[in-house]
Every structure is written in structure tokens, then in C-alpha cells.
């Protein structure tokens, strides 16, 4: 008996609008590249002359240093704020909420200016009992905050508020059953957090956290109000002297692109490494489970069948 087998021809789906959109996008990209590359008013020769200038590189170094220190301090302080927000103590939770609400509401430039004028607002700081006039010591604030320290403190205060919410969201994203399972192991609270909860929370924290680091790197441009020679203020000083505004702004834009590209590459590598580690852990866990099952099967004695007899 012969079977009738029909050959099914698979026809790929066609998306004409997608092709039209790609052509339009390529056309617009070509127009933009031509207008930017061949317009003499962009002054690319000036751009090339200043891009690796030692003064510019020093400004880039200051920007990277502010980003590194601000990130480290905001992660530490933001982590403490996140734990306070998750605390069962209403006082700690309320204080952390108030801090986060305040510094997420204030623009960074306002915080920097207030900190820079701190010695004007408070010429001396005293330690004592409030509302009694009893003081144990005091010191002048005239030289407490310089340009660099003001920039670091301002960036940390503002950035830690955003970092705290990111870390808190990561902990809340962990399934509640994981907390119960960790508590059942009888480990101390800090070990449960570091060894069990935090690795799972990092999957949620890392993408948003790196976005905040990139925002912080660009936000360092706000410290120009302190006359600190980071990248943007250095470029301002140069183009105020040479009147070559556009090419020097392009130098700054290019360096910010380089910084954010490097940070994005680091983010990609960290996320891939974390995913690879999770896959290895899952494979090892499955192997351990299969070995445990095989051992239980081999060690369990075979039961002889029970035969019923009629007497």
C-alpha cells in the first residue's frame, strides 16, 4: 500500500515595512555622517589637536577619580540605607526614607553649591547638648570642605539615595521562600544575607546599578560650579580663551562616550560572568541531586513480594 506524502514548502514570512525602515534609516545615517564629516565649521583639525592634550587628559583623570570614589562611597552608604529601609525598626526605616526622599528631590547642582558655602552658613561646629548651651568642643569650618571634598561629598549624598533604592529593589526581588530557607539553615543574619540572598539580588541590582554609575560619570560635569578642573570645566576654560567652542565641546563629548563605552563593556562582562556562574551552580546542583538519588536506589534493599496464602 502506497502512502501519499505531500511535500510541504516552507515560505518565509515577508516584512516589507521592515526593509523600507532599514533603507530609510541607512539613508538618514549617511546624510548625518556626510554633514558632520565634511562640514568645515565643525573644525575637526582643532578637535584632533586638543583630544590628547595633557590638560584635557588631566581633566579626564579627575572625572574618572570622582566617578570611582563617588561610586564606592555611594554603594557603601546606599547599602546601609537600603538595609535601614528594610529594617523592622520604624525609626530606622523612617529616617532612611526621609533621607532618600530629600536627596532624590534636590538637584545635584543645588547640593554642591550649598556644601561649597557650608562655612558661610556655619562658621563653627560645636558638640554638646542641644538647647542647653552646654558644649564639649567646637571647631571652625573655614577649611573643612575644599573643591575636591565638596564634589565627593555632594556626589555621594545624591547618588547614595538612588543606589539605596536600587539595592532595596534587588532584595525585594528575591523570593520570600529563599529568606525562609536561609533562616532554616540556622546561619547568622549577616551570613544569610551575604552568602544566599545577595548573590540572587545581584541579578536585579547590576543592570540598574551600572546605569547609575554611567549617570554619575556624566553627572561629574556638574562640579564645574566649584571651579574644579574636571573634564567639562577644563574644556570651558580652554574655549573661553580660544573661542573654539564647538570643537572643544566635541572633545568633551567624545571623552564621555569613551568613558561610558568602557563602563558598558565592564557591565556586559560582569553580567556574563554572573550568568556563567549561575549556570555552573545549577549544573553542579543537578549532578549532586542525581548522585544522591542513585545512591539511595542502590542502598535500599529490594523487598521480596508478599504472597497471600489461603488456609
Where would I find each of the regions flagged by the language model?
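Transmembrane alpha-helices and adjacent helix-loop boundaries
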Residues: 1-311
Amino acid at each position: 500500500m502506497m502512502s501519499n506524502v505531500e511535500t510541504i514548502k516552507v515560505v518565509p514570512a515577508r516584512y516589507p515595512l521592515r526593509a523600507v525602515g532599514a533603507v530609510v534609516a541607512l539613508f538618514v545615517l549617511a546624510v548625518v555622517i556626510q554633514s558632520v564629516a565634511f562640514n568645515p565649521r565643525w573644525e575637526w583639525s582643532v578637535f584632533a589637536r586638543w583630544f590628547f592634550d595633557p590638560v584635557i587628559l588631566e581633566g579626564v583623570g579627575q572625572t574618572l577619580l570622582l566617578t570611582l570614589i563617588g561610586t564606592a562611597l555611594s554603594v557603601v552608604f546606599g547599602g546601609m540605607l537600603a538595609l535601614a529601609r528594610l529594617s523592622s525598626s520604624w525609626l530606622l526605616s523612617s529616617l532612611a526614607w526621609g533621607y532618600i526622599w530629600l536627596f532624590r528631590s534636590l538637584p545635584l547642582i543645588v547640593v554642591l553649591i550649598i556644601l561649597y558655602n557650608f562655612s558661610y552658613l556655619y562658621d563653627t561646629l560645636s558638640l554638646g547638648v542641644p538647647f542647653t548651651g552646654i558644649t564639649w568642643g567646637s571647631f571652625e569650618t573655614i577649611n573643612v570642605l575644599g573643591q575636591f571634598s565638596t564634589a565627593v561629598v555632594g556626589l555621594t549624598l545624591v547618588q547614595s539615595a538612588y543606589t539605596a533604592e536600587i539595592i532595596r529593589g534587588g532584595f525585594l526581588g528575591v523570593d520570600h521562600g529563599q529568606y525562609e530557607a536561609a533562616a532554616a539553615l540556622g546561619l547568622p543574619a549577616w551570613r544569610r544575607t551575604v552568602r544566599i540572598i545577595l548573590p540572587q539580588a545581584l541579578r536585579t541590582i547590576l543592570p540598574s546599578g551600572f546605569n547609575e554609575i554611567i549617570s554619575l560619570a556624566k553627572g561629574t560635569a556638574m562640579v564645574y560650579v566649584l571651579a574644579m578642573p574636571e573634564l567639562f570645566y577644563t574644556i570651558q576654560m580652554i574655549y573661553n580663551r580660544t573661542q573654539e567652542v564647538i570643537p572643544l565641546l566635541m572633545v568633551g563629548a567624545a571623552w564621555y562616550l569613551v568613558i561610558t563605552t568602557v563602563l558598558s563593556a565592564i557591565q556586559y562582562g560582569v553580567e556574563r560572568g554572573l550568568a556563567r556562574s549561575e549556570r555552573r551552580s545549577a549544573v553542579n546542583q543537578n549532578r549532586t541531586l542525581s548522585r544522591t538519588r542513585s545512591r539511595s536506589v542502590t542502598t535500599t534493599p529490594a523487598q521480596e513480594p508478599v504472597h497471600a496464602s489461603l488456609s
